[in-house]
Structure formats: structure tokens, C-alpha cells
Amino acid sequence: MKSFDLGEHLNDIYAAFPEANRQPVIGITANYTNGDAALRDKYYEQVARAGGTPVIIPPIADKNAIINTLEHIDGLLLTGGADINPLWAGEEPSPQLHSINATRDEAELLTARLAHNRQIPMLGICRGIQTIAVALGGKVCQDINSASPTLSDGTTVMSRIKHSQDADRQEPTHSVNIKPGTTLSKLYGERAFVNSFHHQAVAKTGPRFNVSATSPDGIIEAMESNEYKSIIGVQWHPEWLGDDGLPLFSWLVERANEFREAKELHERILTLDTHCDTPMFFPQGVRFDQRDPRVLYDLHKMTEGRHDAVIMAAYLPQPQLGEQFSQKVDIAGIIRHNPQLQGLSTQLSPTQYADLIFDKLEQIVDENSDYISIARTPADLYEDKRKNRKSIMFGIENGLALNHDLANVRHFAQRGVVYITLCHNGDNDICDSNRGSAMHNGVSEFGAKVIQKMNDEGIMVDLSHASEKSFYDALDISRTPIVCSHSNSRALCDVPRNLTDDQMRALAAKGGVAHTTFYHGFLRKDTSEATIMDVVSHLEHAIDIMGIDHVGVGTDFDGDGTVRGCADASELINFTLQLLRQRYSERDIAKIWGGNWLRVMAKVQSSKKQS
């Protein structure tokens, strides 16, 4: 018999510690009717059965309410309900359109898009799959009974099957064919029997999703992310199917639990990306405080990806013989978008150009000083994290910036530059490039002095882009460990830009690090698209050759580095998720995400000669 003694129930809770098991929090969108925000019990019961903690999300189209809600959930369940107003998809209403739910539309479309930005696992059910599609570039058929029944291969079938059953909600009434190799096929095999209560369906999934199941008459019954994200949408109602529906909820809870683990890990460790080229976009007037689609790094994306710090490089393209440096860069574009620079000459030296980039970065930081800071040392990075600020460090990509003047090494050290990539795509006065003509047969006499001066000033020597001979020369010349801020494995992708296994071993033997990059041409030599799994493969090969203490991540974002599954800074937590799936420990993930690099940085900076 049920007890009504509150103390008895509390005693059961207080009898052991912890009082409850940790569970991922699953936000569930509520329906809205006549002033009531409500939810059918089947949704939250299935979430609870799967091991999640369900919370109901009311349909409030307020950015503060939505974003703060998303910050506190680990997974999102978008529920069924009325039609979505077709105006949200840029369409006029069909005569067959049923009732809409305007209160839900804006709130849920915003929630879905913002959850996607934050990599939150999602399950969409019925209206929910349509919400995901509309929010992320897909299309919904306003009335499937008015459309010709066509299979995915273009074959027209004789008639539409019944998609709005009269049978009990718990009764499956038609089959769905599930595509092999999908997440759904791992849950249900190649065929499942489902219930059906809809007159609309996803017509086009959009570029971020693949169809994973169809009905016998060709209706899209399920879709899932093709970006290695934990997102599935189904047209049927698994919440009513008891044990048969439970696998989808278990999948959501498992993925939410994994995401919670990754979020908590990012709270505890420092994450540092050692190379991006976002300053290349300054001539286009990009804003770091806006979520700008033109760049892969900004404050929004860093926050969404729960990422702490990045080394932004002042990239200097290497002029060919007869070219002037000022012809290679859009100085006029930077001036155009920065009125305070009006009157500045467009005929800048490489040193002046690098200084201009760092001036602009300092301006960005000054304008957003509550949220971001310039860091010069590992201690600065940890202090910024403690104060909940993002960090930018300065790097130089191409020693051309020194303008053949050793005094500029100290100048850039004083500006806070933490590394200089000795060359880029072409030989310079310091060393030969892997895309050069062996002008010096390795490091030049001047280059040897540059390396020694960098050692004296506590600047890391970066050998990404250097020729193999330059690499070994620099390794012999430098008194401090060498880094490769964004370099991959030649054993997996045989291009001169990548490191051989012998180079990796030599680098590790001298205490250096090589950071895996996301540039597709250094991940795969064939024409197929590079993905986050290729990045993991290159990282793991580097670990096999050098050991866990000599690897890291240098994305090359905004320098053409991007892959499906980790396309910009908002998706960097997805890389952590992949490491967790590969069973890397927290300690090893911390090393990969910058711990190894910071060890080398500390050693290099501590070796600085006192003047």
C-alpha cells in the first residue's frame, strides 16, 4: 500500500550517498493549446525509462529563455503537434494545410537551430522532424496526399498508403524500410513497423541530413545527421510503441550522457587550438562579436563549442620573384573597414603588415574585454579560463614578417608572438619551403641566426610548411624543442607538406610536438571528402609514432582547414566526443587539447635569455 508519510520517502533518499544517480537532462518541447503548455505522458515516461531526466520546455520565443535553457540540458526532444506555418519555409499555404501552432513555431525553430549550433543531441518526432528540417535548410510537403507518391529512385508507385491511422496509437499500421549503415539500422535493422499520424512529411532533408528510412510509398520516415552529429528525426510516434519505441529514447539518452561528459570535461581542462587564419578575413570587415558565416572563429562559435583559446596567425603570403609584398595582401580592404586607419599607406612592409594584424586583434580584444583577452603565457591562459574569458595568442605564419632584420625577433616577442612559422608556400630568406626550389638546401645562414634569436627571445620555432631538409637543420640548430603547429602524417596522406614517421620520431626525441590539422588536402589525397574521422586517424597515427606527449590540434580554420563533423569552432567539442568514444582518458585528452603544447611553450619561454 502506498505510504503518505513524507518522512518515510525522504528516509529512502537519505539512506545512502549520493542521493541520486547522475542522469542527463532531456528537454522536451511542450504542446500549446488555449493558454495551456502541456505534454503527453508517453514522452517523458519513455525518457525516464531510458535513464534520462525529463524537463518540459515551454514555447517561449525569447532568446534569453531559450539559450539559458539550452545551457542546462544535455539532449533535446522535439515533439509532435500541429502543422508548421509554411511562411517559415518561404512558402504560401496549400489548401490542404491543417491548423498551425504559431506559439510553438518561432520558439521551436529557434530552439532547434541554436541547439544545433551547440552540438546538443536531438530527437525529433513527427512535427519534431519537420521542425528540424525547416530550421536547418530542409523542406516540408504541406500535404502528402496531394503529392505524387514517388520512391527515392524516382519510381512512381500506384497509390499512397494510409499515413493517418484510425487504429489505436500503440498499434503499428505500416512498415518502413531503413537504409543500411545508418544509426537507425543499428537500432532496428533494415525494416520496422510503425504507427502513423500525419498528413505532412519532410520533402527535402537539406544539406545536413540524409534520409534513413522511407515508407513503401516513398515518404521520408526518418532522417539523421550526415555531419557526425547526434541528431535523428522520425515521422512516427515511438513514445506510444512501448518497448519497440524505447531504442530511440535510449539512443538519445546515451548520446546526451556522452555530451554531458564532454561538456564537463571542457569545464575542467584547457582547450587550445594552435593555428587559425581568421585575420585573413579582416579585409572583409568581419566582426568577432557577431556570429559571422564568413569565418570559422568568432566569440559565438568559441562559446558554442566550449572552446577556450586559439593562436591566431598573422599570415604573410610569400611573393614570387619580381612581386612586391604589398601586392599580395589587401591592405586597402583593412583600411576600408577601419576608419581610424584612413590615410595609412597601402605600401606596407611585411613587418608593418604583421603589426597591423596584431593591432586589429588588440582592438577586437579591447572592444570585447569582458569576454576575451590576449594571452602570452600558459599562466595567462589558465587565468583567462578561471575568469571565464576566451584567449587569443599571437602567431606569425611566415618568417618573411621579420623583413630580414634580426631585431624584429625581439620586436615581435615584445608584442606577444608565441611562435613564428619559419616559411610558408615558397622559399624565403630563412629556409626552404616544402613547396620551394631548395634555394638554401635547408636553413640559410640568416635562418640559423633567426632560430638562435628566437630561442633567446622565448619564441617557439614552428616548422609547418618547411622542407624536410629545413626541418632537420632547424632541429639541429635550435636549443629548445621545435613545434609543428598544423601538420599531418605523410604515411596516411603522401604529400610533401606532411611529416614522415622519421620526422615525427626526431621531433619527439627533441621534446617537440606536432599538431594535427583539419586541412582536407593534408588529410586525404583522393577526391573524397575529408571528415572528422580522418582527423582522428591522423592524430592516432601520430600518437602511435610519437607517443601521447607529443601531439595536439591545430585546425587551420579560416586557412581552408575544415572537415565534415568539425567544420568550425562551434563544433570543436565534437572532436572531444570522438576522443571519448575512442576511450581516451581525461589526462590524455587534456594533453591533446593543448597540454603538450603548453609544456613546450613553458620550456621555450623559460629558456629566454635575460637581457
Feature annotation, model-predicted:
Residues 1-125, 134-135, 141, 145-187, ...:
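N-terminal beta1-alpha1 cap of cysteine-dependent amidohydrolase-like domains
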Residues 28, 77-78, 312, 422, ...:
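Redox-cofactor binding/interface segments in oxidoreductases and associated redox assembly factors
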